Amino acid sequence: MARSIKKGPFIDDHLMKKVLKSKETKDNKPIKTWSRRSTIVPDMIGLTLNVHNGRAFVPVYVTENHVGYKLGEFAPTRTFKGHKGSVQKKIGK
């Protein structure tokens, strides 16, 4: 279920402070964050955020198309190795 419009988007305060400081100083260093639940807002456009996926930090460069999505959507937590196929299919009988 989507968040109510009257509440506005959720962004962790510590992340928003880092974003505003980075914009103010025009610093190009990536911002490291564990806040996968925060919504991407227009203030973040052009920044690189390192989002934690549980094991490592995944760099996410924010563009206009990312606005409105959550940060966690761009840092997958699981790696899909594929289903085990039969040997006949792999050989190409």
Curated annotation (Swiss-Prot):
Domain of life: Bacteria
Keywords: Ribonucleoprotein, Ribosomal protein, RNA-binding, rRNA-binding
Ribosomal protein in keyword set: yes
Biological-process GO terms, alphabetical: ribosomal small subunit assembly; translation
Classification via Pfam families: Ribosomal_S19
GO molecular function term, any single one: structural constituent of ribosome
InterPro entries in UniProt: Ribosomal_uS19, Ribosomal_uS19_bac-type, Ribosomal_uS19_CS, Ribosomal_uS19_SF
Nuclease among keywords: no
Any GO CC annotation of this UniProt entry: cytoplasm
Functional note: Protein S19 forms a complex with S13 that binds strongly to the 16S ribosomal RNA.
Family of the protein in this entry: Belongs to the universal ribosomal protein uS19 family.
Name of the protein described by the UniProt record: Small ribosomal subunit protein uS19
Species the sequence originates in: Wolinella succinogenes (strain ATCC 29543 / DSM 1740 / CCUG 13145 / JCM 31913 / LMG 7466 / NCTC 11488 / FDC 602W)
Lineage of producing organism: Bacteria, Pseudomonadati, Campylobacterota, Epsilonproteobacteria, Campylobacterales
